[in-house]
Swiss-Prot record:
Any Gene Ontology biological process: proton motive force-driven plasma membrane ATP synthesis
Keyword terms: ATP synthesis, Cell inner membrane, Cell membrane, CF(1), Hydrogen ion transport, Ion transport, Membrane, Transport
Entry-linked Gene3D superfamilies: 3.40.1380.10, ATP synthase, gamma subunit, helix hairpin domain (1.10.287.80)
Protein name, per record: ATP synthase gamma chain
GO molecular function, one term: ATP binding
Function comment: Produces ATP from ADP in the presence of a proton gradient across the membrane. The gamma chain is believed to be important in regulating ATPase activity and the flow of protons through the CF(0) complex.
Length: 288
């Protein structure tokens, strides 16, 4: 019964793994609900900020901020948001494939690329596969704050202010629903014009600023970029927990299938051993 004992040990090992993946699935489900609540709470602010900035991009402004001006793209920047932990299926690798494809297109046109990475998985990926990483941030946990992102975003904004970047994008996973999460790349700078049809007028939007347009726009536009990156981090976190829950459920189900298969093999091995013992007993009795 040496073979049967080995199979029994394998069954015990798989059952232990199944308990772990089941626990991780339940933890991910709990975290997913909390992260979805955080995402939904911050989304109205981010959406409203995006709409206001879209109006400004269409506006006839007294003070023309550099973030509103289009210029030839000679160097572009990406803020890439990933997870800190693995075991979340293809969430990160699909994101990296998308940004790498776009980076390849820029490179073929002779455009240089700078990267700011958020999340240890993005840091490890671009350190291994190449990329000019100028800022990195990780260990934000399950409750990231805007203050933790200001430094990373500030590095890219400074480079843009100094003319070292001509485009700035944010890359993260978008939460569609619990079954669908899609990698997305959105332009932050120069400010994209509003896509709202109601805003597409033949005349330019005009605003009166109090007290002065320059300090107001300077603060507002920086806060816009920070809010979009923060929303990207929160949304990516929700995607991470959903993907991990699904991956752990699949692992738990697969473990159950393996246990069933091993149990069948064990039963057959045990049956064969019993049959052999009976045959030996019968043969011995016949010899007597």
């Amino acid at each position: 019964m040496a073979g049967a004992k080995e199979i029994r040990n394998k069954i015990g090992s798989v059952k232990s793994t199944q308990k772990i993946t089941k626990a991780m699935e339940m933890v991910a489900a709990s975290k997913m609900r909390r992260s979805q609540e955080s995402m939904e709470a911050s989304r109205p602010y981010a959406d409203t900020m995006r709409k206001v900035i879209g109006h400004l991009a269409l506006g006839n402004l007294e003070y023309r901020h550099p973030y509103l001006e289009e210029r030839e793209a000679k160097r572009v920047g990406y803020i890439v948001i990933s997870s800190d932990r693995g075991l979340c299926g293809g969430l990160n690798i699909n994101l990296f494939k998308k940004v790498m494809a776009e980076m390849k297109t820029w490179s073929e046109d002779g455009v240089e690329i700078d990267l700011a990475v958020i999340g240890s998985k993005a840091t490890a990926f671009f350190n291994s596969y190449g990329g000019n990483v100028v800022a990195q941030n990780s260990g934000l946990g399950d409750h990231p704050s805007l203050e933790e992102l200001i430094g990373t975003v500030g590095v890219m904004l400074k480079k843009y202010d100094e003319g070292q970047l001509d485009r700035l994008y944010v890359v993260n996973n978008k939460f569609i629903n619990t079954m669908v999460q899609e990698p997305a790349i959105e332009q932050l700078l120069p400010l994209p014009k509003s896509e709202d049809e109601a805003m597409q007028r033949t005349h330019a939007w005009d605003y009166i600023y109090e007290p002065e347009p320059k300090p107001l726009l300077d603060a507002l536009l920086i806060r816009y970029v920070e809010s979009q990156v923060y929303q990207g981090v929160v949304e990516n976190l929700a995607c991470e927990h959903v993907a991990r829950m699904i991956a752990m459920k699949a692992a738990t189900d697969n473990a159950g299938d393996i246990i069933d298969e091993l149990q069948l093999v064990y039963n057959k091995a045990r049956q064969a051993a019993i049959t052999q013992e009976l045959s030996e007993i019968v043969s011995g009795a016949s010899a007597v």
